[in-house]
């Protein structure tokens, strides 16, 4: 087994005593880095499992509904409910690195592992280290699976299968509000202007990027940090994103953390019904949570938990 890096050593270890496991301390504020979104916050939520191969079943079927998974989970003293267990935020870890240290992760008492976004992304600027462009993981170029950070789709499948052998579930960060700001980097099957809000649609200044956070229409229709804002009222866009999430679940993902969730309108928030959340959330995952930072005038924050649970970053 390869030695742990200094960052990975922060994982910590736990000890057994009388059959009880004392959890390693929970992941701290690393997750605050996890989004570029103009209201940075974390959202809470809800989650797949099998061993020989991950198939197109639900997360529950492959984990809590799987006798082998349950035996491993109970043996490692891990929480049955993901809400009550510690989550290891494996920030910028590859699937292979996570897989190589699964024994330590289980021994430390982590119920779940959260990965970086697993979709295809904009590549780093030529000549620059990827660590200087960490935010590219929040700039999808399409809805394929696999990128320079997490690794290939096959490596993700192997990592989730290994996690399930240890009774651990896997949450993937998911960017479902926008794509990269670089139109040329967007993959061909997504290069359709109807799939994105126009730069003028939200009524924002500065080519659609100057968002008034007291105006919910602008928050949900303008282009956050110039990122191409998905037309989430478009049923085909919703169907495509649902297909991506369902495929990720089939690859062994148990849950999702939805980046910039407050930048996506609620189903009946405006005059025109938005099918987005109603379409994408029934994807077979067991645990889903959204990033919703309170504080914006006009934000109906309590309405989001009706769709998925929300953990706020409270302003002090």
Task: Indicate where each model-derived feature is located.
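Flexible, glycine-rich active-site loops centered on histidine and acidic residues
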Residues: 183-192
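Sec-dependent N-terminal signal peptides
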Residues: 21-40
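Active-site-proximal helices and loops of the catalytic beta/alpha 8
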Residues: 54-86, 97-110, 116-140, 155-172, ...
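Terminal targeting segments of Actinobacterial cell-envelope proteins
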Residues: 1-23
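Aromatic- and acidic-residue-enriched carbohydrate-binding clefts of CAZyme catalytic domains
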Residues: 81-85, 121-161, 192-229
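C-terminal region of N-terminal signal peptides and the immediate post-cleavage residues
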Residues: 37-59
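Active-site mouth loops of central-metabolism enzymes
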Residues: 86-96, 226-239
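Residue-level preference for long, well-ordered alpha-helices that form the structural scaffold
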Residues: 148, 152, 233-237, 269, ...
